[in-house]
Swiss-Prot record:
Pfam families per the UniProt record, alphabetical: RuBisCO_large, RuBisCO_large_N
Organism: Epacris sp
Keyword RNA-binding in annotation: no
Cofactor note as given: Binds 1 Mg(2+) ion per subunit.
Note: The basic functional RuBisCO is composed of a large chain homodimer in a 'head-to-tail' conformation. In form I RuBisCO this homodimer is arranged in a barrel-like tetramer with the small subunits forming a tetrameric 'cap' on each end of the 'barrel'.
Modified residues (N6-carboxylysine): 191
Active-site residue numbers: 165, 284
Family designation: Belongs to the RuBisCO large chain family. Type I subfamily.
Catalytic activity: 2 (2R)-3-phosphoglycerate + 2 H(+) = D-ribulose 1,5-bisphosphate + CO2 + H2O; D-ribulose 1,5-bisphosphate + O2 = 2-phosphoglycolate + (2R)-3-phosphoglycerate + 2 H(+)
Protein name as it appears in the record: Ribulose bisphosphate carboxylase large chain
PROSITE patterns in UniProt: RUBISCO_LARGE (PS00157)
Leading EC class: lyase
Length: 465
């Protein structure tokens, strides 16, 4: 057959409603808003084409390869109920399109140029199904939930953290003092804020030293293993690794990375170093809302969460459901399960478009953080369960008596909620009562209860199904 030049509709090649998906295909669910006059089949096919083998015109080199083997296929389209002119387009990608063990390459293909495509008014990647064959090419989290519990020797309850505030402006010595007060009061972890890197008021090496001193002092006093998320994020990968190496030399248990601003390549390198050297890795999702907050354009956070589990991290921030940041309960629980569990069943009610089998890739602890305090503790314990990290920044440091009493209040509240739950009480219904009862035995908790009882951050969530 001679080569036929010219432009032809994408749907002639890339829309294949009869296609049977393979176990090895990467499957994607896109929310597509076509421009007026563009049929949904053409829009879905355009997404499949531009994110795989296609370009805008027929090229003679198409004849040198097997398009049938390598092309992405739009295999199903359904309208979004209640949304005029929006469709969910399902696309299957052959596994050979992707480099093994590279989240970077996977995203460059699937969410690359296609998002600027003229035929589409908007495009959002709602979910990805990672096939077992591809998941097995990733190391994933450096350690995972069980190994972390064993390292820390802490079982049967969520872990407690605190972000040190004010996030910017403290000297290293004062910062270390704040860390020590929180840890000795009963927290498991304290945390560098995401934008604490190495600024003129506090260089990274000084901070690492004073925080390590605080950790060792608090451990000696309490007999518990403590940690501080030392933020290794830096301007270059080499500098980031240098910071991680120094943390390991200090003998601390955990470092931290901003995975979206730092990038997946840097993150995967750091995760591999952490596994080889026994460091836990805490992941902050700074910049995620730029990508995931718009309902009809961007990438849903559940996809960013899956990508992080592949790239590697032991903790990741996952919203609170009850605090000051976005998050709708069922949807949040959907991606919390995707982070922790080995197998997750398809469940459109929770926004999960595909069943996902992680084939024993270690799990990630979800971190609830942002505007939460002791009155939220029963709800958080119920929603997130034991395998989570609950982080109270202002909710610890804002205590009227200072950091250590703030930490005591949180620890008492948590222990009370876990005990009540284990006794069979209903945290959702009796939560306030449980906290009040515990406050009778803890002056620190009752002082915290008095200061925060009226606080609410209640706006309707943007992220609905």
């Amino acid at each position: 057959v001679g080569f036929k030049a010219g432009v032809k509709d994408y749907k002639l090649t890339y829309y294949t409603p009869n296609y049977e998906t393979k176990d090895t295909d990467i499957l994607a669910a896109f929310r597509v808003t076509p421009q007026p006059g563009v049929p949904p089949e053409e829009a879905g096919a355009a997404v499949a084409a531009e994110s795989s083998t296609g370009t805008w015109t027929t090229v003679w080199t198409d004849g040198l390869t097997s398009l049938d083997r390598y092309k992405g296929r739009c295999y199903h389209i359904e309208p979004v109920p209640g949304d005029e002119n929006q469709y969910i387009a399902y696309v299957a990608y052959p596994l050979d399109l992707f480099e093994e063990g590279s989240v970077t390459n996977m995203f460059t293909s699937i969410v690359g140029n296609v998002f600027g495509f003229k035929a589409l008014r908007a495009l959002r990647l709602e979910d990805l199904r990672i096939p077992a064959a591809y998941a097995k090419t990733f190391q994933g989290p450096p350690h995972g939930i069980q190994v972390e519990r064993d390292k820390l020797n802490k079982y049967g309850r969520p872990l407690l953290g605190c972000t040190i505030k004010p996030k910017l402006g403290l000297s290293a010595k004062n910062y270390g003092r704040a860390v020590y007060e929180c840890l000795r009061g009963g927290l498991d972890f304290t945390k560098d804020d995401e934008n604490v890197n190495s600024q003129p008021f506090m260089r990274w090496r000084d901070r690492f030293l004073f925080c390590a001193e605080a950790i060792y002092k608090a451990q000696a006093e309490t007999g518990e293993i403590k940690g501080h998320y030392l933020n290794a994020t830096a301007g270059t990968c080499e500098e980031m690794m240098k910071r991680a190496v120094f943390a390991r030399e200090l003998g601390v248990p955990i470092v931290m990375h901003d995975y979206l601003t730092g990038g997946f390549t840097a993150n995967t390198s750091l995760a591999e170093y952490c596994r080889d050297n026994g460091l836990l890795l805490h992941i902050h999702r700074a910049m995620h809302a730029v990508i995931d907050r718009q309902k009809n354009h961007g990438i849903h956070f559940r996809v960013l969460a899956k990508a992080l589990r592949m790239s590697g991290g032991d903790h990741i921030h996952a919203g609170t459901v009850v605090g000051k940041l976005e998050g709708e309960r069922e949807i949040t629980l959907g991606f919390v399960d995707l982070l922790r569990d080995d197998y997750i069943e398809k469940d459109r009610g929770r926004g999960i478009y595909f069943s996902q089998d992680w084939v024993s890739l270690p799990g990630v602890l979800p971190v609830a953080s942002g505007g939460i305090h002791v009155w939220h503790m029963p709800a958080l314990t119920e929603i997130f369960g034991d395998d989570s990290v609950l982080q109270f920044g202002g909710g610890t440091l804002g205590h009227p008596w200072g950091n250590a009493p703030g930490a005591v209040a949180n620890r008492v509240a948590l222990e009370a909620c876990v005990q009540a739950r284990n006794e069979g009480r209903d945290l959702a219904r009796e939560g306030n009562e449980i906290i009040r009862e515990a406050g009778q035995w803890s002056n620190e908790l009752s002082a915290a209860c008095a200061i925060w009882k009226e606080i609410k951050f209640e706006f309707p969530a943007m992220d609905t199904l």
